[in-house]
Every structure is written in C-alpha cells, then in structure tokens.
C-alpha cells in the first residue's frame, strides 16, 4: 500500500523522559522565555551565567538515556540479583508488615512524599497532625514527657542523647558509659561522635563496670542486642545521685510488654520505629525517635511539633521551639540535624493508629511466643540458649559448629547472626512464620513442628508492663480500613505538596519525583534486604551503588564516594571528619579552624562544631560574594591552625562567584582543605565539577539534585565525594571491619531510596542531566525577569544573571506599607503556593528556586501571584487599602472566612481568589495564620483532647 504524498513520520518521542517528562518547559516555551530574559539561545544564556573559568571541559557521557520502561526493566534485573532470604539477624533491623492501606496511601502517595518540611504551618496541618500522633505514640511507649518528630536512625539518636547528656549533666566528667549490649553500630557511632569532642567512651557490663562517679552519662540497650532484658532502675538512680544522665535505647515493640524507660527513671529514650511497618530496605530509611523528660526539651535536637491556635483561636499545629535548631543557632545549635525522617515517622504513626494498643500488644506477644517456642526446640536439641529471659532475641552457644549451622541456615533460606566464633544470634519478628522456626531447627539438626511446644512467657515478672499506652482516641478510631483511608485522605488534603503546585524554595530544589523513579523502592527485592546480609545476597544493591557512585564521580570530578551519610548534614559531618582525620594522619592534629562565610547554611557551623573545629566567620560583600580581603586576612591569621573552609557553590545568594578558584588556592596555600557544600549542585551538573575547581570534598543532596523526594522533612541522602587523598578517611562501619568514622547506623545509609537517583540518571543520561541544569538556570532567570520592576533581585552576576535561584527584596514593602515578608508568604497560600525560602540568607527577602521541572504556565501563575501581591502592597502604601485590615495582613483566608460574616473593607473575591489562585481546584488553607508565640509559651507536644477532633470534623 502506498503512503499518501503528504504523509510524514513524526520525530516526536513520547517516551523521551528527559525532554517530555522531567523538564517542564517545551522547546517553544523555552524560546518565549529566552526572549523575556533577552537571549537568542539557551547556550548563550549559560555562557553569560556560568564563568568560563569553572566550565566543565568534557560533556557527561555514559550511554543513551533510557525510557521509563527500559529503566524499570534495568531496575528489575538489578533487583533480582538480590537474594531474598528470611533474615533473623536482628541487631536493630527486623521484618515487619507494612499494612497495604498505609503503603498505598502514604508511602506511594505524592501528597505525602513530595511535601516539604512544615516550616509553613498553615499548609502543613495534615502532616503536623500525623507527626503529633508519632510524638504521642513515642511518649506513651517510653513513659517520658516530650518526644521529637523523628531522627535519622537509632545510632544517630544515641549519639544525640550522649550530646544532650554532656550538655545538661551536673557532672563535669568527660566520659560516657556505653552498655556492651548496645548494637555494634550504635557503639561505633558513639565513638565517632565522642572522639572529636574529647569525650571518652567506656564500654562494658553496666552491672559490673559502670562507675557513675566518672561519667556524665550512660546509655543502656533494652532489650540488649544479644537478647537480655534487664532492669536498669538501680543504675539510673545511682547515676542521678552523682549528677549524671541516663539514656535507654529501647525497642518500641518490646515496650508494649515491658516496663517503660521513664518508669525506670531514664532521662532520655531513643530507638528506631522501623518495625512499626517500615521495611528494612538494606538499612533505611527509618524513623528514629527520641523522648526526654520535660526539663530537657530545649536541649533536644530535631523538629518538635506543638499545638497552638490560629488567628480565630482555633487549634492549629506548628513546629515549636525552633530557636534551638541549627538554622537559628548555627554553631551553638543543639545538633546539626536538618533533614530527618518525616515520611517514615508518618508511616510508623499510622501503623500505631491502624493497630491501636490491642494490635501492637498482640503483635509483641506473638513475636515473644514464637521466640519462646524456638528456644524450647533448641534446648531440646541440647543447645545452651541465653539469656534466661528475653523478648524476641536469643543467643545460642554452638562451639565449633558455628560455620556449619550458619551455612545450613542459608541453605534453608534463613540468615542468622554470627556472634564471635562460637555463638549464633536469632531475632524473630512479626513476619516469622511456623515454617521459619522449623527451618531454623533443621539448620541446628532438629526436626520439629511448632505445635510440639507450648509457648509461655520468658519475661521477668518485675519488668512486665502495667501502665497504659496509646490511650488517646486517635489510636482507637480508625480500625476499619474505610475510616483509615478517609483519615489519611483528610490529612493529605490539608497540605500543599508538589502534586498541587510548584514549591519554589531556594536552596531546597523541589523538583519532580517521577513515579517511575519511585516504583522500585517498594519492590521486596529492594525493601526486604537486611543491611547485614552476606555480600553475595545483595549483589544487586552493590551493583547499583557502584554504578551510581561512578556516575556521581563523573558528575563531580571527585575520585571516591561514600553513600553512608543519610542526610545532607551528616554528609557535611562525614566530610569534615575526613578532613580532620587527614590532618591527624599527617601530624597536623592542631589544625582545627574552619572558615565559614556569614551566608552559610546553619548546618555548616553546627557540623564544624560537632567535628571538633573552631568556627571563624568570614564576611560577605554587599554583592553577596565572599569578602576576599577578609578571607585572605583570616586565612593568613590562622595559617598555622587552618583546617578547612566551607563554601557553598553557587553561593547561597544565587550567583556563580568568579573568585571560587582563588578561594580554594588561598586555603590550600595555608595548609587547609576546601569543603564545597553541594546543596546547589542543581546549577552545576554537566556544566561545572567541584573537584575540578579546587574543592577537596562535597556532599550531594540526593533529595534535591537527584530526585529523592523530601517526604515532608525526610528521608534524604547526603553522600560525600572526595579527592583521592581523602579517600582513605571515608566513613567505615563495624560490619565491614572498619570501626572508625561511622556516621550512620547502616553501611550505605538509606540504601533503599538509592534506586530513585540511579533511575533518574539512567533516564536522563548525561545530556539530559546537563539540559536539566540549563533549564533550571533559565527558569530562575525567567522569574527574575518577570518580577523586574516590582521586586529588586538582590544579587546578580556582573552580567546581570542569577544561577538556579534568585533572592527578591520584600523590605521596601515593609517600609512603604508595613507588609512583612511573612505577610507575603501567607498571601501566597491564598494564591495556592508554598512560599519561597523566607529571610535567608538575608532577612526580609524571599529566595526563589523554580527548578527545571516547572512549566512556563506554572512559572507565570507564580509570578502573577507575586505581582498581584506587590500591587496590594502599593494600594496599602497609597491609602487605597487599610494598613491593618487588608488581604495581606489577614492571609491566609479559609473557607470559614468565605462563608462566615464578612465585615472586612475588601471583598470575598479579592480575599479568596487573587491572581494565581485556581477557582475550581483552589487550595484552601485549613487554618488561619498560626500564632507562633502562643505555641511556644503554651507548649503542648502530644495529641490534644478528643473534643478538639470532633470540633475539627464539624
């Protein structure tokens, strides 16, 4: 059959992920945007934006980009290289069942996983309520007064507990006692944290070796890593007598049956909520918890959700006591924690809401009964089982049979834990089935069935729990799945995430988290692998990590990568520890000064302080660049003790500084190293490599540049890249035999989310990644151009360009109309937008980062909203609007405002449907402006009474 003469084949590629799915503007839209910016081509704009002195010489190249289907096939092939074996290794990681209703409606729901940290409380009420449930759950189970909204992992939480103890203890000792029954990874992390700060770690049997007179605190594992369940009440009382602090690392599932740490007198409790429905995922991510006595709440790290009121007096939630955090206190902060594990904390809290106290107790009892049955069978075979009392973990003395039994267990598709040279550890969980127990018995040479053994309790009677927990009605209201689904939907509808609108947060890179990238994280071949399995059972993971590491090295110009840091702040810390170890290895342990510009992110000075360094602040010029005269002077002044400098590139002011190479040369000349914060890597990929311009180490925020979602405040990943001379000092891990420098509980951090970044790289290819960077720069310059005349862009390059973000000045609005940056942020909610980054790095400004994923239409909607806000401020300044009773001061407006009595001098239409706001699909803030002062003065950090829920539902 002949073709019609006018028929032609299209060159349109429907599965071109980079250009059709990830990058927002179409080629035609880019042309329109370039005209507004004033450039004939995208390359011409890039040439004027990125200094030639730092431009990458060779393009990124690692094969053609894959389609979504090709990438998913590659991921499936890789996942199948992981061997699915039932792991009874324990050691803080356990099999768990994620209720499908939670997997579908939380973990796989972009309304939850694409949200940002809830700094804007009005548009985060759903997430904040879920986190308040988490805090309530933790307080109930631990028997303590105040809990935070998650930490990175149990080992990190233990290190934070040690830091609190040193800060608040009356004892002036410089030693910290660690129970030898703590998990090995916890002990390793405690040693890492203590060494730079000059604290001594004493590991031993607390009932024999603890001298409370010489320590500022102690931590005990409950139950212990080898299974022991012990009462620490007497030891804790002795510590208190001598002015020391007591912390307990407790398994929350065990606390359903056991006396709480608070009832023992503990000051701090930490642990992991992983077994509350969060898969092990080769080490993470999981939400750790921390709870403290009320007296220590202001020393607690991380986010803390509290109850406040809005402008109408209605209940509202917000982040409380923020003045203790790194973004406020910098090197004086309680911790460098920024990203935590909000998405996983939400999952754990929903697990408790779904099961309630009866369900949690039943699961705990079932796990214990299965463990008792297992022990009875092993004892019948003649083995010595320790300890006498336990919850879910036993240790078996096997002598020279250790290797044979471990091998036999693997043949039964079961992993057991190797302890020393003569013992085997076994930990059961809610996924353990009768056939699992029978397989273990066979590995030990027995042929039993579970019904041969009657389970009983092997818990000490004096430690059986008698106090209630999860008593709040929220843990009793949603047992029916229909109600559970609706509850999660109601919470999600209160929030504003990327599934509704762009989130133009400067320095946060809220880009597309593509569905194809997210799918593999729930595959059991990735999600059910224990972090301490033999290497030959995780070949898929090792291939993925190695290939992603090679790609990141190619992108950054570094020689080696560590995937262990599970947040950007932990990456900073790991990089600074590598620099410190390098200096010590070269006999320069006296080098402890870190130069940091005043514009640096708050985690920079906080991390430097944790690494044992002295922070020396460097001035920033009026142009937003490092003040070179001051930098040279400080480098010269501290030449003998200079350890490093920390810089962000492009700068936190949104420009490529021309003098970055000179900065690096000055530091190296004076014996220091250069830490380049990779938070703004989205402006560099494919165009410039940190390792080529003089930097020695950087962390990369995979939850920014490489598409891991922010999850409402975590998870994140902060791997570090280093030049060859620092490679020997990358983080080690006890499981790999390298005990020094561990910064996370698992060897590869939050490994189960690495498939997201890997698939992003596969689908974009080197060319696509470079194009994404260029479009990110175009979008930022387009926004700056559209806002020209209404708002001043504070910082530009010599050629008038910004990098991937821009800072607009809202201070003139305050001067002329009394309109604050907070007013602008709240008015943007009425328009359906999350505000840009507020008052950082300059007070009274907004930092806008649109990313490459936003279309021209969405950018225009955002710009229209800001321009309309500027006109409202002008109307106030000119007397056409009241200075107090106006749409800006009263924002955000709610449905209750719309339908209630209206006595305001502006219309409902103007209040609720400003330019930029959708009419049919408008986002409505569930609360009016939240009262921050009230929330801190009347601190409540657990669920409010049930009456308030009934009121909210009316």
Curated annotation (Swiss-Prot):
Gene3D superfamilies xref list: Aspartate Aminotransferase, domain 1, Type I PLP-dependent aspartate aminotransferase-like (Major domain)
GO biological process, any: glycine decarboxylation via glycine cleavage system
SUPFAM superfamilies associated with the record: PLP-dependent transferases (SSF53383)
Name of the top EC class for this enzyme: oxidoreductase
Annotated positions of the N6-(pyridoxal phosphate)lysine modification: 704
Keywords: Oxidoreductase, Pyridoxal phosphate
Cofactor: pyridoxal 5'-phosphate
Gene Ontology MF term list: glycine binding; glycine dehydrogenase (decarboxylating) activity; pyridoxal phosphate binding
GO CC, any one term: glycine cleavage complex
Family of this protein: Belongs to the GcvP family.
Function of the protein: The glycine cleavage system catalyzes the degradation of glycine. The P protein binds the alpha-amino group of glycine through its pyridoxal phosphate cofactor; CO(2) is released and the remaining methylamine moiety is then transferred to the lipoamide cofactor of the H protein.
Record's subunit section: The glycine cleavage system is composed of four proteins: P, T, L and H.
NCBIfam families: gcvP, PRK00451.1
Protein name: Glycine dehydrogenase (decarboxylating)
């Amino acid at each position: 059959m002949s073709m019609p003469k006018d028929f032609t084949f299209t060159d349109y590629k429907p599965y071109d992920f980079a250009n059709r799915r990830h990058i927002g503007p179409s080629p035609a839209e880019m042309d329109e945007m370039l005209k507004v910016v004033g450039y004939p081509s995208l390359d011409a704009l890039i040439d004027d934006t990125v200094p030639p002195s730092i431009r990458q010489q060779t393009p990124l190249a690692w094969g053609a980009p894959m389609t979504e289907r090709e990438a998913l096939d590659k991921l499936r092939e890789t996942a199948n290289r992981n061997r699915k074996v039932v792991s009874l290794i324990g050691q803080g990681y356990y099999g768990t069942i994620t209720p499908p209703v939670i997997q579908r409606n939380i973990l796989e729901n972009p309304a939850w996983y694409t949200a940002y940290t809830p700094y804007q409380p009005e548009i985060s009420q759903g997430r904040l309520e879920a986190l308040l449930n988490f805090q309530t759950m933790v307080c109930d189970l631990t028997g303590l007064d105040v809990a935070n909204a998650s930490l990175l992992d149990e080992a990190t939480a233990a290190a934070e507990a040690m830091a609190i103890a040193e800060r608040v203890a009356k004892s002036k000792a410089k030693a910290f006692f660690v129970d030898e029954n703590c998990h090995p990874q916890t002990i390793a992390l405690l040693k890492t944290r203590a060494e730079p700060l000059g604290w001594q770690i004493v590991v031993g049997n607390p009932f024999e070796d603890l001298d409370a007179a010489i320590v500022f605190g102690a931590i005990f594992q409950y139950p212990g890593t080898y299974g022991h369940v012990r009462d620490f009440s007497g030891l804790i009382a002795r510590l208190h007598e001598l002015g020391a602090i007591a912390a307990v690392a407790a398994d929350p599932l065990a606390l359903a049956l056991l006396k709480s740490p608070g009832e023992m007198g503990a000051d701090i409790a930490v642990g992991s909520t992983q077994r509350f429905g969060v898969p092990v995922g080769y080490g993470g991510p999981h939400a750790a918890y921390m709870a403290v006595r009320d007296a220590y709440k202001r020393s607690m790290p991380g986010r803390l959700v509290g109850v406040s009121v809005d402008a109408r007096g209605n209940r509202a939630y917000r982040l409380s006591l923020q003045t203790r955090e790194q973004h406020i206190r910098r090197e004086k902060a309680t911790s460098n924690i920024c990203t935590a594990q909000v998405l996983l904390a939400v999952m754990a809290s929903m697990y408790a809401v779904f099961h309630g106290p009866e369900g949690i107790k039943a699961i705990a009892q079932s796990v214990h009964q299965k463990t008792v049955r297992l022990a009875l069978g092993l004892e019948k075979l003649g083995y010595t089982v320790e300890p006498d009392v336990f919850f879910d973990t036993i240790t078996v003395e096997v002598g020279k049979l250790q290797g044979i039994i471990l091998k036999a267990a693997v043949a039964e598709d079961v992993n057991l834990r190797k302890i020393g040279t003569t013992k085997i550890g076994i930990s059961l969980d809610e996924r353990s089935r009768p056939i699992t127990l029978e397989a273990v018995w066979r590995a030990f040479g027995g042929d039993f069935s579970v019904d041969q053994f009657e389970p009983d309790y092997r818990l000490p009677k004096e430690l059986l729990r008698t106090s209630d927990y999860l008593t709040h009605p929220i843990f009793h209201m949603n047992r029916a799945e229909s109600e559970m689904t609706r509850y999660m939907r109601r919470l999600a509808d209160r929030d504003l995430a990327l599934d509704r609108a762009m989130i133009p947060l400067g320095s946060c890179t809220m880009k597309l988290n593509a569905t194809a990238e997210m799918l593999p994280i729930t595959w059991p071949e990735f999600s059910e692998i224990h972090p301490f399995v033999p290497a030959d059972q995780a070949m898929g993971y090792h291939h993925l990590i190695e290939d992603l590491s090679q790609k990141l090295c190619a992108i950054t110009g570094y020689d080696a990568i560590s995937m262990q840091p599970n947040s950007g702040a932990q990456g900073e810390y790991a990089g600074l520890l590598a620099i410190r170890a390098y200096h010590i290895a070269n006999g320069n342990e006296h080098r402890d000064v870190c130069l940091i510009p005043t514009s640096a992110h708050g985690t920079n000075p906080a991390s430097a302080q944790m690494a044992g360094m002295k922070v020396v602040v460097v001035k920033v010029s009026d142009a937003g660049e490092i003040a070179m005269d001051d930098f040279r002077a400080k480098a010269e002044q501290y030449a003998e003790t200079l350890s490093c400098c920390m810089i962000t590139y492009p700068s936190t002011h949104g420009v490529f500084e021309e003098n970055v190479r000179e900065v690096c040369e000055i530091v190296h000349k004076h014996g220091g190293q250069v830490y380049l914060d990779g938070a703004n890597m989205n402006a560099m990929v494919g165009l410039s490599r940190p390792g080529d311009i003089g930097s020695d180490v950087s962390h990369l925020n995979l939850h920014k540049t490489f598409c891991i979602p922010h999850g409402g405040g975590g998870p994140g990943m902060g791997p570090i890249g280093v030049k060859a001379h620092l490679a020997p000092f990358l983080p080690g891990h006890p499981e790999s035999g390298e005990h020094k420098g561990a910064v996370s509980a698992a060897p590869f951090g939050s490994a189960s989310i690495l498939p997201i970044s890997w698939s992003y790289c596969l689908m974009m290819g080197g060319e696509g990644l470079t194009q994404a960077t260029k479009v990110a720069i175009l979008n930022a310059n387009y926004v700056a151009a559209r806002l020209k005349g209404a708002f001043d862009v504070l910082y530009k390059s010599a050629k008038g360009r910004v990098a991937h973000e821009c800072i607009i000045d809202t201070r003139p609005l305050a001067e002329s109309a009394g309109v604050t940056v907070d007013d602008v942020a709240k008015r943007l909610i009425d328009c359906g937008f999350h505000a840009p980054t507020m008052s950082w790095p300059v007070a009274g400004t907004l930092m806008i980062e649109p990313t490459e994923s936003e279309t021209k239409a969405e950018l225009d909607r955002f710009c229209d909203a800001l321009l309309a806000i500027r006109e409202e401020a002008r109307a106030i300044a000119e007397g056409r609007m009241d200075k107090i009773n106006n749409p800006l001061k009263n924002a955000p407006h709610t449905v209750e405002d719309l339908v209630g009595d209206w006595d305001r001098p502006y219309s409902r239409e103007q209040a609720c449907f400003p330019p930029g706001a959708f009419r049919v699909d408008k986002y409505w803030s569930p609360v009016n402006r939240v009262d921050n002062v009230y929330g801190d003065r009347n601190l409540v950090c657990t669920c409010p009474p049930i009456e308030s829920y009934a009121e909210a539902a009316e």
